[in-house]
Amino acid sequence: MAQLKVVTRDGSLHEFEAPDGYTVMEAIRDQGIDELLAICGGCCSCATCHVFVEEAFLDKLPPLKGDEDDLLDSSDHRQANSRLSCQLPIGPELGGMTVTIAPED
């Protein structure tokens, strides 16, 4: 389990324990945070689970792959710390990480 912090679009902070083996997307949806649409269900084909990752944790994440990079390129809100939450597996190294849900495109 890892402590995860999620900032929603209205600035609300949600803190909770996320099970190892889940993705950040799955953990957020299990908390009932509905604004993370994740329309494709985690297949890396829609970019509706776009989040901004806390800078200190970027090096602890798996490398950005081609499909994810291409989908993020389609966002008007892409930043250097943009990732798709469906591509971020939860593990102890992510304990304390904050992600912010990106604005809708």
Swiss-Prot record:
Temperature effects on activity: Optimum temperature is 25-30 degrees Celsius.
EC numbers, comma separated: 1.14.13.-
Cofactor list: [2Fe-2S] cluster
Positions bound to [2Fe-2S] cluster: 40, 46, 49, 86
Function: Involved in the catabolism of 5,5'-dehydrodivanillate (DDVA), an intermediate in the biodegradation of lignin. Part of a three-component monooxygenase that catalyzes the O-demethylation of DDVA, leading to the formation of 2,2',3-trihydroxy-3'-methoxy-5,5'-dicarboxybiphenyl (OH-DDVA). LigXc probably functions as an intermediate electron transfer protein between LigXd and LigXa.
Cofactor note: Binds 1 [2Fe-2S] cluster.
A Pfam family assignment: Fer2
Organism this protein belongs to: Sphingobium sp. (strain NBRC 103272 / SYK-6)
pH dependence, record text: Optimum pH is 6.0.
Protein name, UniProt field: 5,5'-dehydrodivanillate O-demethylase ferredoxin subunit
GO terms of molecular function: 2 iron, 2 sulfur cluster binding; electron transfer activity; metal ion binding; monooxygenase activity
2Fe-2S ferredoxin-type domain sequence ranges: 2-105
Xref: InterPro entries: 2Fe-2S_ferredoxin-like_sf, 2Fe-2S_ferredoxin-type, Adrenodoxin-like, Beta-grasp_dom_sf
Reactions catalysed according to its record: 5,5'-dehydrodivanillate + NADH + O2 + H(+) = 2,2',3-trihydroxy-3'-methoxy-5,5'-dicarboxybiphenyl + formaldehyde + NAD(+) + H2O
Keywords, ordered alphabetically: 2Fe-2S, Electron transport, Iron, Iron-sulfur, Metal-binding, Monooxygenase, NAD, Oxidoreductase, Transport
Summary of the knockout phenotype: Disruption mutant shows growth defect on DDVA.
Similarity comment text for this entry: Belongs to the adrenodoxin/putidaredoxin family.
